[in-house]
Amino acid sequence: MSYINKNDLSINSTLYEFVNKEILPGTDIKPDDFWEKFEKAVHELAPINKALIQKREKIQKKLDDWHKKNAGKDFNKDEYTNFLKSISYLVETKEDFKINTSNVDEEISSIAGPQLVVPVDNARYAINAANARWGSLYDALYGTDVIPGEKGSTFNKERGDKVISYVREFLNQVFTLKNEDWKEISQILIEDKDLVLIKNGKKDYLKNKSQFVGFNGKKTHPTSILLKNNNLHVDIIIDPTSEIGKYDKANISEVIIESAISTIVDNEDSVAAVDAEDKVKCYRNWLGLMKGNLQANM
């Protein structure tokens, strides 16, 4: 393991080369400038971190000593609470307050949905999580036991029909029509700003028209319809030429649902990154996610 001496820093050569050759290019930051300012940050913040760690160790020792001293005694909640307060492990309860935030992404502030946690050292997991915001509802249902019966080694049309029926019922519940059933719709189009659904030549509309967000394609022949409920979107794909769409009454070939809203890319609890090589692997995966060029073999 070799090191590069830079001013008052000793830098692992693997990390040094990674920063200089992979991170900094394209940022307009010169390597010498980066390491100079990084050195300043290290020497400014390291003593603060060291003091905090020492404080934590002192508190932990007091906790350990108390439990050794009181081993075998009946537990006294009030006594223990007062002890925790005396070592500043607990602080006095303050008055209720609210935090006012601004400029926070909707994914954090107002959209309720699943959040994934993935280890950054596993490129395949990280890529899957990054792409998990949108997923096929058809695929999800076909591949799980939500739909009863065997999947088989080849496409099971009977199972596929059950999936489509299930999704239509989902649309009935979430994007209810004024009069009709999604299962009976034979054509979808747009008139003015309204989503129009047709059964036997008769027009129907969403009970809540505000759920219609937009479309792709022509108004008379849209290729996708975007709907929204509780700030979560569903993209209905219309393709009469696809294997599914050409047999579907309304030529719906796919239903894409907004799923995992955000992802925590973990570089701590689920990752064992000890030496520089481990850490560079993690940093390289993170860099690939930020640049959008991370790849993994399946």
Region spans (language model):
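Catalytic alpha/beta active-site cores
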Residues: 2, 82, 88-298
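N-terminal-proximal low-complexity accessory segments that begin disordered
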Residues: 1-70, 74, 79-91
